[in-house]
A protein has these predicted regions:
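Beta/alpha (TIM)-barrel catalytic core signal, keyed to glycine-rich beta->alpha loops juxtaposed to Asp/Glu
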Residues: 43-207
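Intrinsic-disorder/low-complexity, polar/charged segments
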Residues: 8, 15-17, 175
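Short, small-residue-rich loop/turn micro-motifs
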Residues: 1, 34, 123
């Protein structure tokens, strides 16, 4: 909810009217009575958090939405919206992969880990770059993949799963073979040395 691409200028819309219309349309299109988790897609610079929060609470109260979360929210965006809601925000879907490592140190993961929120990682394979690029990072992914008998996608996913924030990768593929390969990430146990071996390559230098 919150993203509006059907107008002349692409924009965000977190008004109660747009959120309610989006939810009703989704329920109708999917033929269901309740949405498991509704995500506010991105921070809206024009969001009135009292209006948005009240609308989201009302959807939960009405049984149309089981839980509410966010996508691409920074901690301060999260706190602003949560301050105007009775129901808890339960998850934040953020960009996170070996190609986008900022959340490991910019406070995003620490914030959600502190409060016990579910973190979902979108683009966990770096938009496919980790599967096609040739670099020191992919070389290291391949070396671990060979040792573990999996492919580099599984290792890149295992890197996220090893974090104590209990990250849930969100896969952007319907390819059953790809999903099967990625599911083998659970077979990959990265110790601290191997985790930092990959992190170092993603960072481009040794850690300080």
């Amino acid at each position: 909810a919150g993203r509006h691409s059907g107008a002349c200028v692409k924009h965000y819309d977190t008004t109660a009217e747009h959120i309610n219309a989006s939810v009703d349309a989704s329920l109708s299109e999917m033929g269901i009575d309740e949405i498991d988790v509704l995500l506010v897609h991105r921070p809206d610079p024009l969001m009135d958090h009292h209006v948005t929060g009240a609308a989201l609470d009302a959807l939960v109260d009405a049984g149309k939405v089981r839980a509410v979360g966010a996508s691409n929210f920074r901690p301060w965006d999260w706190n602003l919206l949560q301050s105007a809601m009775r129901h808890p925000l339960v998850t934040n879907q953020i960009e996170l992969s070996l190609k986008h490592i900022a959340p490991f140190t910019n406070g995003d993961l620490a914030f959600h880990q502190q409060h016990g929120h579910l973190v979902m990682a979108w683009s966990p394979l770096g938009g496919g770059d980790l599967m096609t690029a040739a670099s020191e990072l992919t070389h290291r992914l391949d070396s671990i993949a060979t040792r573990c008998g999996v492919d580099r996608a599984a290792v890149a996913t295992a890197f996220l799963l090893a974090h104590p924030a209990k990250i849930t990768p969100v896969l952007g593929t319907n390819n059953l073979d790809r999903i099967s390969h990625i599911s083998s990430a659970e077979m990959v146990e990265l110790d601290r040395q191997h985790w930092f071996y990959l992190y170092e390559a993603a960072l481009g230098s040794e850690v300080p």
